[in-house]
Amino acid sequence: VLTGLSTDYLPSGCVPWQYILEDTDSYVSVYKELGYKTMAVHPYTSSFYNRKAAYPKIGIDELHFDDDIYALGEELGLTIRGRQISDDTFASAIEYYLDKNSDSPVFLFGISMENPQPYPDKFETPDIEVRNDAFDESTANAVTNFATGVSDADKCLKRLVDYIDNRDRDTILVWFGDHLPTLGG
């Protein structure tokens, strides 16, 4: 999405970031040339998918991963949902970094981490229960936990929209999923 490069010619199942070996034009680099601060927020390990090495090559200057979020834990109201840093904490981190850089335009690329697989028994107390006679117990648990994660993502989106609506700075929010869920397939 950030580079506009197609993955059609890459090996199936590969990690596209591993192919970013030199400076590569991207939407990020365009904003950087226009004077924007460029940053990424991802509440997971920096080595995953080679992000720490690849992001600077597409123009991202500031990288904030799980260790940064844990360090700001109290300030952000750190919570864990399932096995990951919650989407609510992810929203807090985005607000924190935007507020911290309110004196300049910012391009911030954020990737949440609360709702990836595995889904069975992910949340101790899911907010949503999905039952269907066609589902065995394992499938019902996976769908229930996935739906709870989607609900949390929806709350995160609403929180960010409300935050943006109350900012004194023009802000564009682009929200998308970067892959389909793996629900036992």
Question: What is each model feature region?
Answer:
Residues 1-185:
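Solvent-exposed soluble domains appended to multi-pass membrane proteins
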